[in-house]
């Protein structure tokens, strides 16, 4: 067999293996994905050709290539987390994903490498995030290495390489319908907001109006430049644990204490009814 044929054979085999793996992971993810039924629906956005037919294939290709090429890095981070923080190595959390046909967000399990301890108070309640976040965990977040595990979310179809960053379920309940339009695009590992230096919803609203191949490539290149060349993270600057959207609205006087408590109650109910 010639060298060219060997390369073509290996490339074809790798592509088939990636496709099968993505299919299996997607079926598994469907069993843990549920819908946020307690919030009002938004109007689903019409997707273009690229977003509807091309983007998913590129996501699988990019995620598979990243896992294969950077497998030593994945293993190294996993071993460090195991040594520094113990088990589990992977942290999962429910996050709002793509809006379904009925206008309500699906909620999926997002994967991250663990950055915090499980320290609890005398009542068995977890201590605040800023207390449980270790120096090692803060470094993982600063370098965005904790985000590497999200490539498996990309493979299972709950996330994309590029798209609005997935917020917390409780953040979603505080958003207006216009702000929730960000969820009409699949959540991403990086997005327009991150390469512009801040996690602002307005950037996500701009992104959904111009989803396209050229824009995604530009954001990927900007992300590589920011995360690897400039060695900056893709999270909000100077915030190891970002402020919840509801806390921000309450702090700035944009909502009342009563509204705040009501939205928090809805968020807890969404998570509780999921069987969590």
PLM regions and their residue ranges:
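Short, intrinsically disordered, charge-balanced linker/junction segments flanking boundaries
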Residues: 187, 191-199
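A short, structured surface patch at a secondary-structure boundary
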Residues: 127-187, 220-223
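Positions in alpha-helical segments
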Residues: 63, 91, 134-138, 170, ...
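Acyl-group handling in specialized metabolite and lipid biosynthesis
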Residues: 204-209
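Feature marks short, surface-exposed loop/turn motifs that line or immediately flank catalytic pockets
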Residues: 117-120, 158
């Amino acid at each position: 067999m010639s060298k060219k044929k060997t390369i073509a054979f290996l490339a074809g085999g790798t592509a088939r293996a990636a496709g099968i793996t993505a299919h299996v992971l997607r079926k598994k993810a469907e069993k843990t994905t549920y819908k946020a039924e307690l919030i009002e629906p938004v109007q689903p956005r019409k997707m273009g050709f690229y977003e509807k037919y091309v983007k998913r294939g590129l996501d699988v290709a990019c995620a598979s290539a990243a896992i294969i090429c950077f497998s030593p890095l994945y293993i190294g981070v996993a071993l460090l987390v195991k040594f520094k923080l113990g088990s589990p190595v992977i942290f999962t959390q429910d996050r709002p994903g793509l809006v379904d046909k009925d206008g309500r967000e699906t909620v999926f399990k997002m994967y991250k490498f663990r950055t915090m301890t499980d320290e609890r108070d005398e009542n068995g309640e977890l201590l605040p995030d800023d207390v449980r976040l270790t120096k090692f965990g803060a470094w993982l977040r600063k370098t965005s290495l904790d985000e590497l595990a999200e490539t498996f979310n990309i493979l299972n179809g709950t996330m994309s390489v590029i798209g609005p960053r997935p917020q917390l379920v409780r953040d979603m309940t505080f958003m207006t319908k216009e702000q929730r339009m960000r969820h009409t695009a699949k959540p991403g590992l990086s997005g327009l907001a991150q390469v512009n230096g801040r996690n602002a919803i307005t950037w996500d609203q701009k992104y959904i109006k111009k989803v396209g191949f050229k824009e995604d490539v530009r954001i990927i290149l900007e992300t590589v430049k920011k995360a690897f060349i400039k060695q900056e993270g893709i999270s909000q600057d100077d915030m190891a644990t970002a402020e919840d959207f509801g806390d921000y609205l309450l702090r700035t006087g944009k909502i009342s204490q009563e509204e705040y408590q009501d939205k928090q109650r809805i968020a807890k109910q969404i998570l509780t009814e999921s069987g969590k």
